[in-house]
Amino acid sequence: AKLGHRVTLIGNVGVDNGSDYIFKAMEQHGVNTAGVRRCAGEDTGSSFIFLAPNGESVIAILSGANASLTPDDITSNERLFDNAGYCLIQTEIPLESAKVTAITARRHHAKTIIKPSSCDYLPDSIVANADILVPNEHELAIIETEGKTMEDKAAHLLERGAGCVIVTQGEHGCYLRGQNVEC
């Protein structure tokens, strides 16, 4: 939104000071919050990122209201996918909701970017709907058990249907693997 692009968010927040701050910030930057629901009795989800000098990070995630985002929340907001160019999906929401989001985005011809974090596995139904899959090295080891090397794991994700895989590597940059590119 800060770069002048239309941004729309679908998700859940709690009814707390955190959500008040989030709504004010999104409003200031022109983010469409029509798909954001306030959930009474829930805390707003939060993440704490600890970054080491070498670029490696440790992330602690408290899902909060994000854990209650349902596939129905996505389908009831399908109109928000109209004319979307990209759809960024984080897996701090339930995997079934992430799957429905990816399928819905694809149906609307949006490129899907999936950032798998805080999940024990990533089902084929999500991988196959990812135009761009962006795990870090640790997440890659969790979501892809086939292969021993990063390169083998990324290649297997392509076989499972991902369009391309970008593995972030802290201070070492990133590794890109697509159907016709590897670097």
Residue ranges and their predicted role:
Residues 85-86, 132:
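Structural motif
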Residues 57-58, 181-183:
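Short beta-strand segments
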